[in-house]
């Protein structure tokens, strides 16, 4: 088995030597990161001097900062290797292309304005309001301060405060929800309209990517993680010059945990690969496992996988034969994973059938499993109860962003250790908590407090 593992790494090395793009699939515990490390070391050993002379680099794209740091720890620092999260790298690559970014920003704003116009036209107030006069009233800074101060208040309180500010609004408050939506949409339309005119008049500001908050502020030329990927996809896939600059600078691109990579990123890399195919001087290696897709935004199965050489590693270096056998039953995709060891035979597993009245604590006690037992819970409600944040989750589910058809956002944006995936709402909550902690800490500096205020 160990010789077969060596042969698999040799197969990867040959793809790198021949600039043949590949997809390396390996199950849990197979040593994907180890294979990635060995691949980089192979390139450095065989092509390291040429890379330095040509001012070229190996690009290793990771999904999280934790993965980035792990790879850097294993490799050590090397000037010929760039290990970066995809957002960090893409912004560094595209930030200088302000003319192209501004054009994308203009198109994005136009698209948003179309959506807002549809919402305005669909609002029950649209036929009863003279928009220009209404806009002048609601875009007043004093009104907006009052409006947002009571935006989440009960309907009765909201009506009283708004009427108290200006009796003009009284006829439009029969439906508080319609009024709130109408004010927000008209105000957003007004602000985006100003920014669009600036761009069309060639008076635009620089487009900026904010890695801290996953929320667009298009009127301020600030874009979030998702919008950065959208802009980069549109720009790079349509610009052969940028594809050439990319492939000339980074002839070796290795993508860690490809299954969690956004499809827009895969499209970018795929377009560069197709552009460079005839030159035989660019290779892409995707490392991962389609069934270990954690984040909702990831591709899972690699698109156009048939265009990449498929390399599979079925060996598990981490677990006993019994665990590997159990994993195979759960995967149920005939991957055929097996332990790399012939003498790692330890433990057993059993299946139990339970009904809706199942009680985990009673089950563990009756089966003498109280000690040395780890439990994998599948439902968010069960996880939150076991970890002691069930009240927080219950409160969160009252927000439209995390209820009904949007319930999957609880997993995608809330139950996250990866800050890049965390939604703007919770990111802002964490930022505010951080501010409270800093402001009450006697060791905090004025600079730290000011930084929070300026970024909020």
Which residues make up each language-model segment?
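The feature marks helicase ATPase cores and/or their adjacent C-terminal helical subdomains
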Residues: 1-456
